[in-house]
Regions:
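Conserved N-terminal beta-strand and adjoining loop/helix that marks the start
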Residues: 1-19, 65, 88-92
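Residues that recognize and position ribonucleotide moieties
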Residues: 12, 33, 119
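Conserved Nudix-box catalytic region and its N-terminal flanking loop in Nudix hydrolases
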Residues: 18-56
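Structural signal for conserved beta-strand scaffold positions within catalytic alpha/beta enzyme cores
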Residues: 21, 69, 119-122
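Unchanged
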Residues: 40-63, 74-131
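Generic short beta-strand segments
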Residues: 68-74
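Nudix hydrolase/Nudix homology domain
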Residues: 108-166
Length: 166
């Protein structure tokens, strides 16, 4: 089976039991909660990617970042003959509360924005049905059970619509 690699840089902002997430609109994580972040541009450093992606997807300015770490997951969508090895660099971030929040644009400089906006998700409401593998990794970490080894999702379901809350 073919394995494609994807590398991205993502923000972990956890306050008062809630995780800052974005609502994905396309791709394998569509209609799921995901972390703010994404792919690097040519010549861009990790923290430059981090701050740019957070601004584009949430409108927030990152004040500080710390605790860099890397996780990975293997995702094979239902009925696909390839798997994606998603490698993620994560940083804990604090937002600059004094900076004005920028309006999120549907179109960003590198194409169409793939998020509907941001949401503060209660960590207890995050499930495999409503979240991306990235968010699930972070949830485990925040609950004190970090999954340091690779995780496999062999029949990943791409949601056609947003899951309903129970």
């Amino acid at each position: 089976m073919e394995i494609k690699r994807h590398f991205g840089v993502y923000a972990v902002c956890f306050e008062n039991g809630k995780l800052l997430c974005i609502e994905k609109t396309r791709g394998p994580y569509q209609h799921r909660y995901d972390l703010p972040g994404g792919s690097q541009r040519l010549g861009e450093g990790l923290t430059e990617t981090l701050t740019r992606e957070v601004m584009e997807e949430t409108g927030y300015t990152v004040r500080s970042y710390s605790n860099p770490r890397i996780y990975d997951v293997f995702v094979r969508e239902e009925l696909k003959n390839f798997m994606v090895h998603h490698v993620m660099a994560l940083y804990d971030v604090e937002m600059d509360e004094d900076a004005p929040q920028v309006t999120i644009s549907k179109a960003v400089s590198d194409g169409i924005n793939d998020s509907l906006g941001y949401i503060w998700m209660d960590i207890q409401e995050i499930t495999e049905e409503n979240a991306s593998p990235l968010v699930l990794k972070v949830k485990s970490e925040l609950l004190g059970f970090p999954e340091l080894d690779k995780t496999f999702y062999m029949n990943w379901k791409v949601n056609d619509e947003k899951p309903t809350s129970s």
